[in-house]
Structures are given as structure tokens and as C-alpha cells.
Amino acid sequence: MTKSELIERLAGQQSHISAKTVEDAVKEILDHMAITLADGERIEVRGFGSFSLHYRAPRVGRNPKTGDKVELEGKYVPHFKPGKELRDRVNIYD
């Protein structure tokens, strides 16, 4: 599901709220989450999961076209850990 599809679905379920209002709310939430992570903070949504940053250590990679070695710097990447309730809801193959 894309962000646009999410906005459409939410707006369709909430007929008393305009699509523009839903779009603004979704964008505001995502912007605030990005800012919070950029500040090094963790985000926890009970029953859904948590977002945090994980550090990727520097390493040697390879250019896929040439095969040359490339030094990759260490960096922080966003990480999502689903909560138990979400894991249980999506575990339909038991």
C-alpha cells in the first residue's frame, strides 16, 4: 500500500473528513516521525510496533558494474520492530 492508497482508504472510511484533511494529517504524522528519528529518539506505537535507528558499521562493498571495492561509511538506518499484537494479526499461516 502506498501513501496515496492509505490516504484514499482513510478518506473513504471517514466520509465526514475531507481527503485533503486526511492527506495533511498523514503527512504531518510521517514528517513528525522522521524528525523524531533524526533526533535519535525511539517511537513506540503500542500494539503496532516501534521505530528506532540501528547503526550499520563501515564496511567494504563492491560496485556491481565494475566489481571494484568501495569503502562504505558507517550510517544509521531506520528499523521497525513489530509489536506482538501486529505479529499476531498478520500471522495468518498458522
From Swiss-Prot:
Top-level taxonomic group? Bacteria
Tell me the InterPro entries matching this sequence.
Answer: Hist_DNA-bd, Histone-like_DNA-bd_CS, IHF-like_DNA-bd_dom_sf, IHF_beta
Question: Keyword annotations for this protein?
Answer: DNA recombination, DNA-binding, Transcription, Transcription regulation, Translation regulation
The family database entries (Gene3D superfamilies) matched by this protein are listed as: IHF-like DNA-binding proteins
Which SUPFAM superfamilies does the protein's record reference? IHF-like DNA-binding proteins
Q: What GO molecular function annotation could you give as one example from this UniProt entry?
A: structural constituent of chromatin
GO cellular-component term (any): chromosome
Q: GO annotations under biological process?
A: DNA recombination; regulation of DNA-templated transcription; regulation of translation
Pfam families of this UniProt entry? Bac_DNA_binding (PF00216)
Function, in words: This protein is one of the two subunits of integration host factor, a specific DNA-binding protein that functions in genetic recombination as well as in transcriptional and translational control.
| Family of this protein | Belongs to the bacterial histone-like protein family.
Subunit organization: Heterodimer of an alpha and a beta chain.
What is the name of this protein? Integration host factor subunit beta
Provide the gene name from the record.
Answer: ihfB
